[in-house]
């Protein structure tokens, strides 16, 4: 692992806003078509000027993803993409200077261990985690681990979410 890291994605978004621009955030499924190819694609996107990259971690039951991401997820899992590959990709991309977030279902984080995941992810320079299936009401353990490791946490909401839930 290297020591030079990209700033967090929130910093990059703030920098874009200060320029009067919208932040450009690219999405890549890690491990598709291969882990190294996804890393090369991420570096190319960084070189082309994206403000941040969101890496999608493949999950065996990607019910909240669309068909294209589902197909990429299946292909990545069939090729053996594992959580260590995610940390490798984040390490490579943050060392290349790009702020890197991860989108993952909650089950892989629990399987790895919440505190261990947060520490390992922060150790390779990750910015934060987007957890589409972890409601904020159930996120206390993740919030504590993320805060302890300086990670951003992003919950998703539906258009029908009441204002009190978004506060």
Question: Residue locations for each model-derived region?
Answer:
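N-terminal amphipathic alpha-helix/helix-capping segment at the start of soluble metabolic enzymes
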Residues: 1-27, 90-92
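Distinct, well-ordered alpha-helical segments
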Residues: 111-117, 140-145, 166
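Catalytic beta/alpha-barrel core
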Residues: 77-81, 125-138, 151-162, 166-167
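N-terminal positively charged helical leader segments and presequences
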Residues: 10, 14-17, 35, 43-48
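Active-site mouth loops of central-metabolism enzymes
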Residues: 24-40, 100-113, 153-160
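Active-site beta->alpha loop and helix N-cap motifs at the rims of alpha/beta catalytic domains
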Residues: 4-7, 41, 46, 52, ...
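Mobile beta-alpha loop/short-helix "lid" or hinge segments that flank ligand
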Residues: 59-62, 107, 140
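N-terminal glycine-rich anion-binding loops that anchor highly charged ligand groups
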Residues: 16-23, 48-63
């Amino acid at each position: 692992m290297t020591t030079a890291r990209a700033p967090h994605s929130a910093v990059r978004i703030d920098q874009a806003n200060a320029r009067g621009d919208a932040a450009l955030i690219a999405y890549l499924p890690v491990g598709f078509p291969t882990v190294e190819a996804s890393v090369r694609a991420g570096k190319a996107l960084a070189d082309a000027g994206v403000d941040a990259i969101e890496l999608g971690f493949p999950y065996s039951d990607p019910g909240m993803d669309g068909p294209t991401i589902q197909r990429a997820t299946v292909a990545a899992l069939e090729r053996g993409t594992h959580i260590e590959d995610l940390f490798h990709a984040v390490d490579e991309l943050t060392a290349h200077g790009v702020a890197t977030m991860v989108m993952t279902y909650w089950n892989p984080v629990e399987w790895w261990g919440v505190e261990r995941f947060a520490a390992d992810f922060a150790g390779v320079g990750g910015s934060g985690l987007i957890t589409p299936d972890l409601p904020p009401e159930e996120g206390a353990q993740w919030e504590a681990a993320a805060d302890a490791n300086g990670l951003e946490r992003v919950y998703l909401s539906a258009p029908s979410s009441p204002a009190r839930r978004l506060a």
